[in-house]
Regions:
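Long, compositionally biased low-complexity segments
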Residues: 78-346, 385-709
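Mature, structured domains enriched in cysteine- and short glycine motifs
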Residues: 334-390
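Generic low-polarity alpha-helical segments
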Residues: 1-11, 58, 347-351, 355-356, ...
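Alpha-helical assembly-interface signal, strongest on the long, hydrophobic N-terminal helix that forms
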Residues: 2-92
Length: 709
């Protein structure tokens, strides 16, 4: 039958003029259906994928438990190392203090503190080993509880999440805290055993040094310290008109030395000889001036023989000048044949100098010895005898206004100074020898403590695997109802698996944890007395754990700075320098204090790092899932059983934290704890088993069968 052309055009969906109204409506309906279908698919996928976020959160929560445990391990390591360093450093400071008589009481306390800190280190090592092992064994439960708690906390709007975490590796060997090296114990015992001998040697050296110090002070006063009163410097300026360059003045005995006095005397006599003049024109005045010149010439020659040698030892020669006639007779002044001789009658006459009126026409010369050996006449003009020359020295030696008086006191003091140093040298030398050996022992012991550290490879050290499931009923079109897409039933169970591993976080948090340790002891009144001396050292030793050798050097310097090192013998300063030098060569390396933070990774990476049956099963399941996607649900039947066996443990009670160990020093105690996840308070081991059962039930509801392990 033929259709009229007009009617055919009315029912056409396409013509040369475009689409009809019916065609447009159909196209719009198809487009809207596709849009809403795509949106529905996206929503279903989005809702389903939330379980992966929960699995990730559970893995991170479980990883945080392991990270917290590693903080405790590092704290225990820092305590063990710092207590060893504190013990050895305190012992070294005690040895230094024993070298100073005024600090020997402090030295005894420091030596005792060193021994008691070592005992505390031994006690801490035992409790830390037990405590860390106990917490390590609880890590699987703690991690599982934390993951399960996070999963439950995310349940809302119809979602019902369950998660179970497994640590890789799932177990670890007990943690051992190494005991100190035998060298450290031997070094402390030797220091304590030889302390009394070092004290006695230091006392003898100090007594000798004090005598030497007193002699030097007296010499300084007689040389220039008494200025503007009478002294060598004042007399040299007044009598010989010496310049400041020839006649220096020192304000402190510490800056002065015996060589200053000797050089002053060596410059004085030539200068004094150059300015010597008779008091008047009388024969007696001229004779006395001539004899003074004779004495000054002799004195200049004698003093020029003097020397002062200072360095490791002291040696000096201050030639003594005659102070009276008897002493003059023992010098070359008495034997010098330099005086003119005149003969009047049968007896010769000796004259003081060539200018004597009675010496005119003399043809020979003789000495005072010659005069006293024969029956010689005394000159009626100059009256020259041996006593005349003896009085020249006596006049300036016996009273304080004479240069020779002060020079003689310096010469005597130099002899006393040298004698005292020589008497103290053996004791000082022996003390240095003993202290050097003891400090070398402590240095060697400090060098070895770095090898006795605490290390751990706990469960979860390589990573965490978390299984999560959402069994809550959730309509496919919930919140997105539409007439374009018809939805019925509920979304099925959504499952996911995630993994996390620990990575370093250089944020400085690890350093803060270590630094806060000392605060507990620093404020504890139980540390007063003996152990108070070691508290500051321990703070420095903790810094050495973080910063290495530089902090150890600073701790030693600070400890030395608090000691009473002032001593005449100088043993205290020497021992302090020796201690610093010895510990400077220890070569302590800083520990890695980067905090650990969990980060999500591919589960294969974690599984490959473990060698347990669970890891092998997980890798095999992942391989099969890739090869046979439809069998991927077997991950739960294969894995959950292993998790359940490894995690399920029963604990009687939990608090906010677990105590790993306690630092106990002389009554002061600082606990080292591991914070527990909040979930542990109300999350018993039964909940872990229930979570595993629920996961297996999910698998049964999907596959129609239940596998029992």
């Amino acid at each position: 039958m033929s259709v009229p052309r007009r009617m055919a055009q009315a029912f056409s969906l396409r013509d040369e003029d475009g689409m009809t109204t019916v065609g447009m409506v159909v196209s719009l309906l198809l487009a809207l259906s596709m849009i809403f279908s795509s949106a529905q698919v996206y929503r279903i996928q989005s809702v389903s994928s939330r379980v992966q976020s929960v699995a990730d959160a559970g893995a991170l929560a479980a990883g945080n438990v392991v990270a917290e445990f590693m903080v405790a391990v590092r704290v225990c390591d820092s305590v063990a190392l710092s207590l060893s360093l504190t013990s050895l450093t305190s012992t070294g400071l005690g040895i230094v203090a024993c070298c100073v008589p005024g600090g020997q009481g402090v030295g005894a306390k420091l030596l005792e503190a060193g021994a008691r800190v070592a005992d505390a280190r031994d006690s801490f090592s035992k409790t830390a080993s037990e405590g860390l092992t106990r917490v390590q064994k609880a890590l699987p439960f703690l991690a599982a509880a934390s993951a399960a708690s996070v999963a439950q906390g995310n349940g809302s709007n119809g979602s019902d999440y369950t998660a179970l975490a497994l640590l890789v590796p799932d177990s670890a060997e007990d943690i051992r805290v190494p005991q100190e090296d035998a060298r450290a114990k031997q070094a402390r015992e030797d220091a304590i055993g030889q302390a009394e001998e070092v004290k006695e040697l230091a006392r003898r050296a100090e007594e000798a040094a004090l005598r030497a110090q007193d002699a030097k002070q007296r010499a300084f006063d007689h040389d220039c310290g008494a200025r503007p009163g009478w002294c060598m410097a004042e007399r040299a300026e007044t009598l010989a008109h010496m310049t400041a360059a020839q006649n220096p003045v020192f304000s402190s005995v510490d800056a002065w030395s015996f060589s200053v006095a000797l050089r002053r005397a060596q410059a004085y006599y030539p200068a004094r000889l150059a300015v010597e003049r008779p008091d008047d024109g009388s024969v007696q005045a001229q004779a006395q001036s001539a004899l003074r010149k004779r004495f000054y010439t002799y004195a200049a020659k004698e003093v020029a023989r003097g020397y002062v040698r200072e360095g490791d030892s002291f040696e000096a020669l201050f030639p003594h000048l005659p102070a009276n006639t008897a002493q003059m007779r023992e010098t070359e002044l008495f034997a010098q044949a330099v005086y003119p001789v005149s003969v009047t009658g049968a007896s010769p006459t000796l004259h003081a100098w060539d200018g004597c009126p009675k010496a005119a026409g003399s043809t020979s010369r003789a000495s005072l010895r010659d005069m006293e050996a024969g029956a010689w006449e005394t000159c009626s003009e100059c009256g020259f005898t041996a006593a005349s020359l003896g009085k020249v020295a006596a006049a300036s030696t016996s009273i304080g206004n004479g240069f020779e008086h002060h020079y003689e006191q310096v010469a005597l003091a130099a002899e006393e100074y040298q004698k005292a140093l020589e008497e103290g040298a053996p004791a000082k030398r022996e003390a240095k020898s003993r202290v050097t050996k003891l400090l070398d022992q402590l240095r060697d012991a400090c060098s070895s403590v770095g090898a006795f550290r605490i290390d751990a490879d706990p469960p979860g050290g390589k990573g965490v695997v978390c299984l999560a499931v959402n069994t809550g009923p959730d309509a496919p079109d919930k919140g997105f109802e539409s007439a374009f897409v018809q939805a019925s039933g509920q979304l099925g169970c959504r499952v996911a698996i995630s993994a996390a591993t620990l990575v370093a976080d250089p944020s400085g948090e690890g350093r803060s944890v270590i630094a806060s340790l000392a605060d507990g002891l620093a404020s504890d009144s139980a540390l007063a007395g003996v152990l108070g001396a070691a508290a500051g050292v321990w703070s420095g030793a903790l810094s050495a754990y973080a910063d290495g050798q530089s902090a150890l050097d600073a701790a030693v310097r600070e400890g030395v700075g608090g000691l009473p090192l002032v001593s005449a013998s100088g043993l205290g300063d020497w021992a302090a320098d020796a201690l610093s030098d010895a510990f400077r060569t220890v070569g302590l390396q800083p520990a890695n204090l980067d905090a650990l933070r969990p980060a999500t990774v591919n589960t294969a990476h974690v599984a490959q790092a473990g060698d347990s049956a669970f890891c092998a099963r997980l890798l095999e399941v992942k391989r099969q899932a890739v090869e046979h996607p439809l069998m991927s649900n077997d991950v739960f039947s294969s894995v959950v059983g292993a998790v359940r066996r490894d995690v399920l443990q029963r604990f009687d009670a939990w608090g906010d934290s677990m105590e790993v160990a306690t630092i106990s020093i002389g009554g002061a105690q600082v606990p080292v704890t591991v914070a527990l996840p909040p979930a542990v308070k109300g999350f018993a081991s039964d909940a872990i088993g229930a979570a595993a059962d629920k996961l297996l039930s999910v698998y049964a509801s999907v596959t129609g069968s239940r596998q029992w392990d």
